[in-house]
Structures are given as structure tokens and as C-alpha cells.
Amino acid sequence: MKSKRQQKLYDHYKTVFGEEPIFSLKLKKNVLPTDMKPITTLVFKPTDEMPFWKLCTIGASDYLMPERDIGFGRKANRRNEYMMLIFPDVDIRNPSDDEDAPTDWLSLNSLLWATAEYAFNEKDNITVSDTIDMGIDGKYCGTVLLLPEIFKTPSTVKCYVSEHKYISIFQVMPITRELLTKKLRKKANGIYWLMEQFYTHDDDYKLISSKPFATL
């Protein structure tokens, strides 16, 4: 049974992508932190208009993050959900329905889930441009939060649950140790530099190229 907030999110994703998810995965309660509500990934297949996989969370926004100042008198939103956009050639199938389904794509979903759990675990507020170093070995060491600029409508990143309250939806991009190290070396300039690796802008901040898809 979905809560009203979760139903609004589900409907928001359906409206944005123009279709129902082909399947969903729920993070098992026995691996969740104590008192954290379950998180579900909705999987939307590539389409002609959006030729890439969309993995979208529902449940992270059940946690009300603490207030956070982000400068110039502004505060970060306090409820987030997350999406990961994946290259269409990655073979994504439901392992519950197909015993031959590959499972390597689940490593990307694990990064998505770890990001979705982070604010609750750390009792912190995370927002666009934040990086999370998960300290893991392998191709990726963590993630960065982006605005999913591949979508032309700004409404994609806000799911209104009432007239003045909304849930922010950030894109989760896996990052390598090399990228994270370069970002840290650049200090204050590293935040903008890292985001520009995925969405590149000109001097007027007009988007001129993008590489927004995760891959294995």
C-alpha cells in the first residue's frame, strides 16, 4: 500500500516518462538501517523519446532531512528522491522473473540505493553537486548528485505533494576514484568541474553537450 506521497511520486514518474515501470525492486527491510522505511526502485525501459533506462526511487523522501543553508539566504529542500539514467545497451531484466537475467546491472542499482540511504544514515541533508565517497573498490567509488538536464522540462525535478511543498528528484551519477580525486585537488573549483564532466555549458550557462548515462 503506497502512502499519498508515494502515490504522487509514482504518478509523477509515469507522467514524466509517459509509461508504467516494467518492474520494481524493493530494498529488503533486513538490510535497511533501523527505523528506515523501505526504498523501491521503479525501472522504466528505453523509449523512442527517452532512449535510455530510468531507475527511480520511491521511499527516500519519507525521511525529512535537517535544514541546510545553501547560501544567499536559501535553504535546501528537505525531501529527496533519486534517479539514475543508464545506457540503453545495458541488459536490465527482472531477476525475479527471469532466471537467466544478468545481475551485473544491480551494482548500479546498489549505488542508487546507497545514495538514497545516505541522508538517513548520516542524519544529513544532501542536494545537487554533493558527492558521496562510499569507499568501495571497483569501477566506481561513489556518486554525485546532478540536475537531470537531459530532460527539457524543469518540472521533472519537482514532485509537488501540496501547493507549496515538493520532493526534489536528483540524478545520481556514479563516479570513479580518479574523478573524485581530481575534484578534490581543484578544491572550490572542483564542484563545478565535476558537474561539467556530465553536463557541459558555455559561458552563458547554456547546455552544449552531455554525457549523462551510467554504464557498467
Language-model regions: role of each:
Residues 1-67, 73-78, 83-216:
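Acidic, proline/glycine-rich low-complexity IDRs
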